[in-house]
Amino acid sequence: MRCLPVFVILLLLIASASSVDAQLKTKDDVPLTSVHDNAKGTQHRRIMAGCCPRFYQCCYPG
């Protein structure tokens, strides 16, 4: 029973600690938005490359 107050205090300290990023950023880290934009651009290029010459509506998605 003596350990219970210590355990509760430790839990409170852990919960109140400010969130810290455990991993430091390096120069190779890429923001997620950049990856998302690259994926959208790749998808658009694939659609444009598969454009059917007979029906030009399929060339422009959306």
From Swiss-Prot:
Compartments it resides in: Secreted
Post-translational modification: Contains 2 disulfide bonds that can be either 'C1-C3, C2-C4' or 'C1-C4, C2-C3', since these disulfide connectivities have been observed for conotoxins with cysteine framework V (for examples, see AC P0DQQ7 and AC P81755).
Alphabetized Pfam families for the sequence: Chi-conotoxin
Signal recorded as keyword: yes
Gene Ontology molecular function, alphabetical: toxin activity
Maturation-removed propeptide residues: 23-44
Residue positions where Proline amide is found in the record: 61
Principal subcellular localisation of the protein: secreted
Signal sequence interval, chain numbering: 1-22
Coiled-coil region: none
UniProt xrefs under InterPro entries: T-conotoxin (IPR031565)
One Gene Ontology term, aspect cellular component: extracellular region
Keywords: Amidation, Cleavage on pair of basic residues, Disulfide bond, Secreted, Signal, Toxin
Tissue distribution of the protein: Expressed by the venom duct.
This protein's domain notes: The cysteine framework is V (CC-CC).
Similarity remark: Belongs to the conotoxin T superfamily.
The protein's name in its UniProt record: Conotoxin Sr5.6
Source organism (scientific name): Conus spurius
Lineage, top ranks: Eukaryota, Metazoa, Spiralia, Lophotrochozoa, Mollusca
